[in-house]
Design a protein with these regions (language model features):
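N-terminal accessory targeting/assembly segments
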Residues: 1-85
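Conserved beta-strand/loop subsegment of P-loop NTPase cores
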Residues: 72-77, 99-111, 130-136
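Switch/coupling subdomain of P-loop NTPase systems
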Residues: 45, 70-71, 88-102
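Short flexible coil/turn linkers enriched for glycine and charged/polar residues
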Residues: 8-10, 70, 100, 126-128, ...
Length: 173
């Protein structure tokens, strides 16, 4: 038996990274599909040599959106502009993550496009205690700071479509 962490879920296959860094393509046995918990990215699991998830280890946290477990922090990404910040959606996501008791880093991407209204909003979130990181993949502002925030932590990226989550991940890679 091999233990590892689920790093990807795609088309019914779960990709499990073992302690040596090897990725195993796995399926879930029927009895686990009918169980109390569905398998999430971040779950620590035991897998068989023939590529089946045999058991799911305990979780210390989990979220529904994004569907992840056992994470150290969430980087919640919004864009300063294009698309404009939807404050209602941002606040809903903050509440959801806070409810899961997971530390949050609020990342304002595309900061090179920031206007005074967005600056005032950023100051408000800072004043109530959120860690705020300003980034831009256009001029690479804050990318080193983001690398530092990610170091030695299991992190989920969340945020609306088009805010630059993938661009940020590519920039820190």
């Amino acid at each position: 038996m091999i233990t590892g962490i689920v790093v990807k879920n795609m088309n019914g296959y779960f990709y499990v990274q073992d302690d040596t860094g090897t990725i195993h393509e796995c399926k879930v046995r029927g009895r686990l599909k009918k169980g109390r918990y569905s398998l999430l990215v971040g779950d620590r699991v035991t897998i068989s040599e023939d590529g089946f998830v045999e058991s799911i280890h305990g979780r210390h946290n989990s979220m529904v959106r994004p569907a992840v477990a056992n994470i150290d922090q969430v980087v919640l990404v919004v864009a300063a502009h294009e698309p404009d910040i939807n404050e209602l959606l941002l606040n809903k996501m903050l509440v959801m993550i806070e409810h899961a008791d997971i530390p949050i880093v609020l990342c304002i991407n595309k900061c090179d496009l920031m206007d005074s209204d967005t600056e005032a909003m950023v100051e408000l979130y800072k004043s109530i205690g959120y860690d705020v990181l300003m980034t831009s993949t256009y001029d690479m502002t804050g990318i080193e700071d983001l690398r530092h925030v990610l170091q030695h932590k299991v992190t989920a990226f969340a945020g609306p479509s088009g805010v630059g989550k993938s661009s940020l991940l590519n920039a820190v890679d």
